[in-house]
């Protein structure tokens, strides 16, 4: 009798990651009239609503999307255009379709890690640092190495010593209002970081 070999089940971290990706894709899917868990009524219920009349007093190009739905997963188009102009004023050329707005730092960090970090990569982080960050490279199977954080930023001697031993793919540090210390990079430490990065 012919018997097919069944593939072995995926590793637990892979299964969990696939489940999360599937859930994220479902959240971005916008073909449902009523989206359970969204907390917003169907668009047809909002026609003629007092809230819609209130929003129509603003100078918005698309009143129907303001406050009633998620809109583009890339972010609010007029804001992306405004950011393009602000970047251009700083001699940075960008197009609105090349700008992605995130729902906050955790969303941004997650996107960066998913696209840049491979299993086995080394990642430097502030120590102490922003603890919600630490699980993300761990899930990506990266090696996390802490860089001592002082009152004026990362300890440059510690960073230099660890750079001599490791080749990090990225160093996650926070320049202003560091979490949890509240410290801000001094100009000297900022310059030192630039020199070490070269």
Positions of the model-derived regions?
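N-terminal basic, amphipathic alpha-helical segments
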Residues: 1-56, 195
């Amino acid at each position: 009798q012919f018997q097919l070999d069944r593939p072995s089940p995926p590793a637990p971290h892979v299964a969990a990651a696939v489940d999360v990706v599937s859930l994220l894709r479902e959240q971005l899917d916008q073909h449902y009239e009523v989206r359970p868990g969204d907390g917003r009524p169907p668009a047809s219920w909002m026609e003629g609503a007092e809230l819609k009349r209130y929003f129509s007093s603003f100078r918005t190009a698309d009143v129907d999307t303001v406050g009633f739905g998620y809109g583009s997963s890339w972010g609010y188009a007029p804001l992306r255009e405004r950011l393009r102009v602000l970047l251009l004023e700083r001699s940075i050329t960008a197009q609105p379709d090349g700008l992605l707005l995130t729902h906050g730092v955790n969303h941004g960090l997650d996107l960066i890690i998913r696209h840049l970090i491979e299993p086995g990569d080394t990642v430097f982080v502030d120590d102490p640092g922003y603890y919600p960050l630490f699980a993300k490279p761990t899930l990506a199977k990266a090696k996390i190495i802490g860089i001592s954080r002082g009152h004026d930023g990362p300890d440059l001697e510690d960073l230099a010593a660890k750079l001599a031993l490791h080749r990090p793919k990225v160093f996650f540090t926070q320049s202003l209002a560091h979490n949890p210390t509240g410290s801000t990079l001094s100009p000297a430490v900022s310059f030192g970081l630039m020199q070490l990065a070269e």
